[in-house]
């Protein structure tokens, strides 16, 4: 037997070894893997723009625009089939010394429905398969046992999903928990007990279950967000979204860098979150589906208020606002009249300074001048964004509706 003092000495040696190993391991860690108390000084920043981003330790690398096109899907063609009904049973009661017990075949169970449900945690149609088959009902049994009905199959889709059949809109799942029965399950078959009659005391007839309903549905996603950034290609919308949130859309010096909508979350005190959508750049004639205009414009329909992003370095920048409002109005009447703010981006460029006064004179309203690249005047945008959100919330509550919570 090992003496107690020897055991405690060995235990002390083991703990000391573990302590030396932990210190040496932390010393060899890269800066990106440091513990929270060793994080970079940027995490301690108290500026308004930095507080709008939720501070997190570096993790996985952001998805590139090419990979994002695989993960973000805004259209699906789905074949949905309801569950088949179970077959009825044809049998007779069997009991000792009772030769003619009568029919006791039970009915089959009903097939399960296929239901689409709007889920707040789902942001894309990428998880939706191209075919769904509902659960079938069980067959009936003897002793008047009915078959169990098939379970309901739920398909989770993001909020803002339009369900179309043959070019006709059959459902609009715009709220959390909205459901739509995509395919009905088949009815269960009848057992021979169902056909018992005065003129037929021993029926042997039973019916099979009915097949489930089959439908081809087209799912279209319209991005649901509080604010939607609208502008021409290369206006700096993606750079602006990166500056005020943790979203990481692709940024490059050529137009049409963004091909799919991005949604960034701006954080405020009191755990308030405002969702801002970066809509791909639209061009003149977008309402006629030029440059995939219809595919881009439909993501603006669900935005509660708009942010018109103008490239201040371009000649006559006020024409950009007029053209954007015209395209929105031609696409959907009243869309351009929603609450909005005008953002003049790229003020850090020399040619932008000369256009600023002309822009204000032509528009005759407040213009938020900033630079997404340098972060100049981002605080004014964040404060004005909060004002637009408060006005939207007050209007929704005044009409007895709950505002959108992200």
From Swiss-Prot:
Location of the OBG-type G domain: 225-390
InterPro entries: G_OBG (IPR031167), GTP-bd (IPR006073), GTP-bd_Obg/CgtA (IPR014100), GTP1_OBG_dom (IPR006169), GTP1_OBG_dom_sf (IPR036726), OBG_GTPase (IPR045086), P-loop_NTPase (IPR027417), Small_GTP-bd (IPR005225)
SS bond list: none
Region described as Not localized in the mitochondria: 30-406
GO MF term set: GTP binding; GTPase activity; magnesium ion binding
GO cellular component: mitochondrial inner membrane; mitochondrial matrix; mitochondrial ribosome
Nucleotidyltransferase among keywords: no
Annotated residues for binding of Mg(2+): 238, 258
Example GO biological process: mitochondrial large ribosomal subunit assembly
Signal sequence annotation: none
Positions of the UniProt region annotated as Localized in the mitochondria: 15-406
Subunit architecture: Associates with the mitochondrial ribosome large subunit; the association occurs in a GTP-dependent manner.
Record-linked HAMAP family: GTPase_Obg
Role summary: Plays a role in the regulation of the mitochondrial ribosome assembly and of translational activity. Displays GTPase activity. Involved in the ribosome maturation process.
Assigned protein family: Belongs to the TRAFAC class OBG-HflX-like GTPase superfamily. OBG GTPase family.
Protein name stated in the entry: Mitochondrial ribosome-associated GTPase 2
